[in-house]
From Swiss-Prot:
InterPro entries registered for this protein in UniProt: ATV_ORF273
Pfam families hit by this protein: ATV_ORF273 (PF20828)
Keyword Secreted annotated: no
Organism, scientific name: Acidianus two-tailed virus
UniProt entry tagged with the keyword ATP-binding: no
Gene Ontology CC: virion component
Keywords from the named record: Virion
Chief site of localization: virion
Subcellular location: Virion
Name of the protein: Structural protein ORF273
Length: 273
């Protein structure tokens, strides 16, 4: 893991991010460390503001390992100051105070269909009206932070390959049927139509659609509604068979920063029902 950042600093613009805090992006482990370091910075800033948690946020990691807020980078691209071709990974964070929800998110917290579809289409050469393209994006990173009463407790970083997710959801076949093979700019209506087919019309998990298959396990694992148990277990098994296993790194908060732990430790901490 990279050197810990012990000084609290506010970055007002992209150009103010110091070069010495940038790591090279060569593999998933380094991507996870980049994300972990960025979340630590957000936690330190929240403590400076006397906040007891952090907000959900979205970042891009570039091929050279630099990390930027996604909205800021999009603006820079639109102004012609940055290149969308440099975007290598997209980072989404979720923050929760519920340990069961934390475990659910790291086990079943796949990206939204909208995000997977957008990234796949742009990699395939399509453009989506009024969207900054990410033609070279390779990874979708989902980071989940679990907070206790006044401090963070655990962090899990899941790294998914975009192409593998798209294939599991049969997105290439549906795109070919609806749009053909010739890349072009597509409308919002065309995008929404494909998203609806992928999420709501194809029974891909134990006879359930993608949207249904995420709601049912949530009711069982997080809400502890046992009436969903049988279907939830069937869906969970099908889920593990269908979707690629992400590269996963887990951390526990110790004093001032996160330390890596065996992800199995988190499962052992789950209260027995």
């Amino acid at each position: 893991m990279g050197e810990k950042i012990t000084e609290e600093r506010e970055f007002q613009s992209i150009s103010e991010i110091p070069e010495e805090e940038i790591d090279a992006t060569n593999d998933e482990e380094k991507l996870a460390d980049i994300v972990e370091n960025e979340i630590e910075k957000e936690i330190r800033k929240s403590k400076t503001r006397k906040c007891k948690t952090i907000e959900n946020f979205y970042y891009y990691i570039l091929r050279d390992g630099k990390i930027y807020p996604a909205s800021d980078y999009d603006i820079e691209v639109e102004k012609g100051k940055r290149s969308a071709n440099d975007i290598y990974a997209f980072v989404e964070t979720d923050v929760t105070r519920d340990f069961d929800e934390f475990l659910f998110d790291i086990d079943y917290g796949l990206p939204s269909i909208s995000d997977i579809l957008k990234f796949y289409l742009e990699k395939a050469g399509f453009r989506i009206a009024n969207e900054v393209p990410t033609p070279n994006l390779k990874y979708y990173i989902h980071a989940v932070v679990e907070f206790g009463e006044d401090r963070p407790q655990y962090l899990a970083v899941n790294i998914y390959d975009i192409d593998s997710l798209a294939r599991a959801l049969r997105i290439p076949q549906i795109v070919e049927q609806k749009l053909g093979n010739k890349p072009r700019t597509i409308t919002a209506d065309e995008f929404n139509d494909i998203e609806r087919i992928v999420a709501e019309e194809q029974p891909i998990l134990a006879g359930y659609t993608y949207d249904e298959a995420l709601r049912i396990p949530y009711h069982y694992y997080v809400d502890h509604n046992n009436s969903f148990k049988d279907d939830a277990l069937k869906i969970a098994h099908a889920y593990l068979q269908l979707f690629p296993t992400p590269y996963q790194v887990c951390y526990e908060w110790k004093a001032r920063w996160f330390n890596k732990i065996d992800c199995l430790k988190l499962e052992r901490l789950k209260p027995s029902s």
